[in-house]
Amino acid sequence: MGLSFFISFISTSEEAVIALNVHFVAACAFLFGTFYYIGNAISEPARMKEHLPNKDAISSTMNHYGAQLGFKRAKYPKEKKYFQSENMAYVFAIFVGALMAFTGIIKSIQHSIDLPGFVVSAATLLHDIGTVAMLLFLLAHVFFAVLVPWSWKTFPSMIHGWMPEEEAKKEHPGWYEDIVSEEQKAK
């Protein structure tokens, strides 16, 4: 890929300006999200821990989606607040986000400091791969959060923060048990 891949789609200076503006808007959104996340993780470190996958992440993910797709051998796991598939996606997003930020900084520095061509070429290639990976991740995120029928009941909770009790019992049994036990301890 690299820079040549994207340049092949641009034939006029107006198209180049549009491409740079789109990149600027995307970079601003990406950086806002990155710094928002960093601030959130610093202010509430426990939230970061609940996003990390556990040792059963792969088998839990396979069972979760196997049960959703109706495979009889798949047993629905005791998911907590976040599914293990979401926790694995979290690690992927952190890795790709760090890759894009690091390579973006290298690509920006090249305008101030004379860097070797192979460094800039490698940074460009990795930045482009990260971009494609993040776009595919975004599409998968929208697909699994909004488009598949099994998410339709839980999607509104991502907006208003509330979920019907029966849905919480079904979709997030481990989290539901934690909440009930905390409520019983408080009584």
Model-based region annotation:
Residues 1-187:
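Membrane-embedded alpha-helical bundles that constitute the cytochrome b-like, heme-associated redox core
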